[in-house]
Amino acid sequence: MQPRSPVRTNIVIFTILGFVVALLIHFIVLSSPEYNWLSNAEGGALLLSAARALFGI
């Protein structure tokens, strides 16, 4: 079995890290009062209550 290419390994690692950082940034922005569109929208309260019931928050 041949060793894996370092370039391929770096691509996979940085892709996963990029998604993690993107999700972290989106959740931080979403938790701020100015950009929290889930609580400010008309159907947002219903969506939040459904998510809380689903995840037990």
UniProtKB/Swiss-Prot annotation:
Statement: the UniProt record of this protein carries the keyword Chaperone? no
Instruction: Provide the GO MF annotations for this entry.
Output: bacteriochlorophyll binding; electron transporter, transferring electrons within the cyclic electron transport pathway of photosynthesis activity; metal ion binding
Q: Which domain of life is it from?
A: Bacteria
Sequence ranges on the Periplasmic membrane side: 31-57
Task: Specify the protein's topology with respect to the membrane.
Answer: Single-pass type II membrane protein
Residues on the membrane's Cytoplasmic side span 1-10
**Any idea which positions bind a bacteriochlorophyll?**
H26
Descriptive protein name: Light-harvesting protein B-808/866 alpha chain
Q: Which organism is it from?
A: Chloroflexus aurantiacus (strain ATCC 29366 / DSM 635 / J-10-fl)
Protein's gene: puf2A
